[in-house]
UniProtKB/Swiss-Prot annotation:
This is Threonine--tRNA ligase. It comes from the Bacteria. It comes from Thermotoga petrophila (strain ATCC BAA-488 / DSM 13995 / JCM 10881 / RKU-1). One of its GO terms (cellular component) is cytoplasm. SMART domains: tRNA_SAD. Its cofactor is Zn(2+). It catalyses: tRNA(Thr) + L-threonine + ATP = L-threonyl-tRNA(Thr) + AMP + diphosphate + H(+). The lineage of its organism: Bacteria, Thermotogati, Thermotogota, Thermotogae, Thermotogales.
Length: 640
């Protein structure tokens, strides 16, 4: 029986049913093929093709290639661990690819795998790569699979959850794994890898299950790319907010009493307050009204909103006086209650409510991560209530606000627009009008964007913003979401020109997103060296010796009187120690005062990067500092 295969150049060829991409690659002279994409699905090179299809061969140069070779590297890792610790002692979890790498979870009997063991595992992996073992894909019955994995409890659990009567396994040498693929043709195709770290991970992410040992690794087709990535990881570690935050006395975490709920220390609160002050200024200028809504509200509210049915497992509850309350996971229902507290005319619209609202959402302990993934956080939430005809202008205003805020921190960003999914609610004509309004606003703002067709929420289209930090990482922060569901559930209306009720449009939007997460991103973006306007301490005044204390204290008070955050460091430590500590605390400016400075009335200024500026007039320094802080400059003006 023949099948038709359509190639990327548009040509269609006939082949015998059961032909493999490897055979097609040979015919076409594509010697470097490692796999294929068949009807949009990643496909092993030796896997038979049974039906008509569109086919594209994949080489190591293609964007799909990492999925093949990193998945195979995870299997090579598991095979190496079983060789070292003994097949009978290792229970296998899962080993997927992740962004820029892979991992595998192990349950090792009578043994402990630590980061000190990674070099010997790497050596065994190199042996497996050198053996260049063929990788074979096979479909077997569930009954066969149960026998094959009879000593692998985690695999047996997975087998029972797979739909249908057959499962897929992969074999390389003595190693067999339950896996959907895709994989390389053999273990010797890609040689450049590195095991990165070891951590604990609960099976299936649940604290009720056993804790497994997770080994992370990465792999690249070229050694140069691997080396560059490892350098990138070193830089990322240097910037890790989980290390810098406590070191700079910004925040602390207490996993015993408040897991996932950060404690902000005095210096961290300074930064948070500056972020909120900056945001409030811009929101006031743009006609937003700040409100404050309760942290705990009755269960009936959450039943109306739908959170009770669809989000309860992520919520915290309180029972008092035979009434059930929920700690709010989102701010929108509260904002709707504020809107509905009075009759609204079309003349009142748009109404823009804004809140730094504290929310709580349960996250499994295994996914908590510093400030980036927490259970308690503050959202810079706003909800705009408007008429359908006002959508475009309101979105345009939000886009301008986002651009202003992100530009202040030196962030660039990319934009994604997600459109109507199949299981949407609401009239398609309204969806079409709303989506067109979003597109028009993006285009009027001069923003290029990617369209994710059918990936909007069921209750409305949305725009997502992915900011890029100083080392090129992307973070999803701002969101603009149109909502057709909440106004219907809560009967959110306004009185139109015809004196009748009309359904209002509701726009959810956040710019920082989670204030805590944005703070963590900023710590890593600036490597803890905040611009002066954000810095917890802006100036350290350091007398050279005890006899200079009085004069230095007067200068510290003079600068402090101007509203700047000053640390007068008259501790009985060496001058070198105090300067070094100011530098490690990332204080933008140090004023060093000795006989010469106090006699001349001129000061010596040293920046945190080590640049020295001598004979500076104090009032000139104060004026420069004022300009730098009021204009929220990113750079240190005294270095200019």
């Amino acid at each position: 029986m023949k099948i038709k295969v359509k190639l990327p150049d548009g040509k269609e060829k006939e082949y015998d049913r059961g032909i493999t991409p490897a055979e097609i690659a040979k015919e076409l002279g594509v010697k470097k093929a490692i796999g294929a994409v068949v009807n949009g699905e990643l496909w092993d090179l030796k896997r038979p093709i049974e039906n008509d299809c569109e086919l594209r061969l994949v080489t190591l140069e293609d964007p799909e290639a990492p999925e093949f070779y990193r998945h195979t590297m995870a299997h090579i890792l598991a095979q190496a661990v079983m060789r070292i610790y003994g097949k009978e002692n290792v229970k296998l979890g899962i080993g997927p690819t992740i962004e820029n790498g892979f991992y595998y979870d192990f349950d090792i009997k009578n043994g402990k795998l630590t980061e000190e063991d990674l070099p010997k595992i790497e050596q065994e992996m190199k042996k497996i790569i050198k053996e260049n073992l063929p990788i074979e894909r096979k479909e077997i019955s569930k009954e066969e699979a149960r026998k094959l994995f009879n000593n692998q409890p985690y695999k047996l659990e997975l087998i029972e959850e797979i739909e249908g009567d057959r499962v897929t396994i992969y074999r390389q040498g003595e190693f067999v794994d339950l896996c959907r693929g895709p994989h390389l043709p053999s273990t010797g195709v890609v040689k450049h890898f590195k095991l990165l770290s070891v951590s604990g991970a609960y099976w299936r992410g649940s604290e009720k299950n056993p804790m497994l040992t997770r080994v992370y690794g990465t792999a690249f087709a070229k050694k140069e790319d691997l080396d560059n990535y490892l350098k990138f990881l070193e830089e990322a570690q240097r910037r890790d907010h989980r290390k810098l935050g406590p070191h700079l006395e910004l925040f602390m975490l207490n996993t015993e009493y408040a897991p996932g709920m950060p404690f902000f220390l005095p210096k961290g609160v300074v930064v948070l307050n500056e972020l909120m002050r900056f945001s409030r200024e811009l929101h006031r200028e743009r006609g937003y009204q700040e409100i404050f809504t309760p942290l705990i509200m009755n269960e009936q509210l959450w039943k109306i909103s739908g959170h009770w049915d669809h989000y309860a497992e992520n919520m915290y509850f309180i029972e008092k006086d035979e009434e059930r309350y929920a700690v709010k996971p989102m701010n929108c229902p509260g904002h709707i209650l504020v809107y509905k507290s009075r009759t609204v005319s079309y003349r009142d619209l748009p109404l823009r409510f804004f809140e730094f609202g504290r929310v709580h959402r349960y996250e499994r302990s295994g996914v908590l991560h510093g400030l980036m993934r927490v259970r308690s956080f503050t959202q810079d939430d706003a909800h705009i209530f408007c008429t359908p005809d006002q959508i475009e202008e309101e979105i345009l205003g939000v886009l301008d606000l986002i651009n202003t805020i992100y530009g202040q921190f030196g962030f660039t960003y990319r934009v994604e627009l997600s459109t109507m999914p199949e299981d949407h609610m609401g009239d398609e004509a309204i969806w079409e009008k709303a989506t067109t309004a979003l597109k028009n606003a993006l285009e009027r703002a001069g923003l290029s964007y990617k369209v994710n067709e059918g990936e909007g929420a069921f209750y409305g289209p949305k725009i997502d913003f992915h900011i890029r930090d100083s080392i090129g990482r992307e973070w999803q922060c701002a969101t603009i979401q149109l909502d057709f569901m909440m106004p219907e559930k809560f009967n959110v209306t306004y009185i139109g020109p015809d004196n009748k009720e009309h359904r209002a449009v509701m726009i959810h939007r956040a710019i920082y997103g989670s204030l805590e997460r944005f703070f963590g991103i900023l710590i890593e973006h600036f490597a803890g060296a905040f611009p002066t306007w954000l810095a917890p301490i802006q100036v350290a005044v350091i007398p050279i010796s005890e006899k200079h204390n009085d004069g230095a204290e007067k200068i510290a008070k003079r600068i402090s009187q101007e509203g700047f955050r000053v640390f007068f460091d008259n501790r009985r430590e060496t001058l070198g120690y105090r300067i070094r500590q100011a530098q490690t605390q990332k204080i933008p400016y140090m004023i060093i005062l000795g006989d010469k400075e106090l006699e001349s009335g001129k000061i010596s200024v040293r920046t945190r990067t080590g640049k020295e500026i001598k004979d500076v007039d104090l009032e000139h320094f104060v004026e420069t500092l004022r300009n730098e802080v009021l204009s929220r400059k990113l750079e240190l003006l005294m270095e200019g």
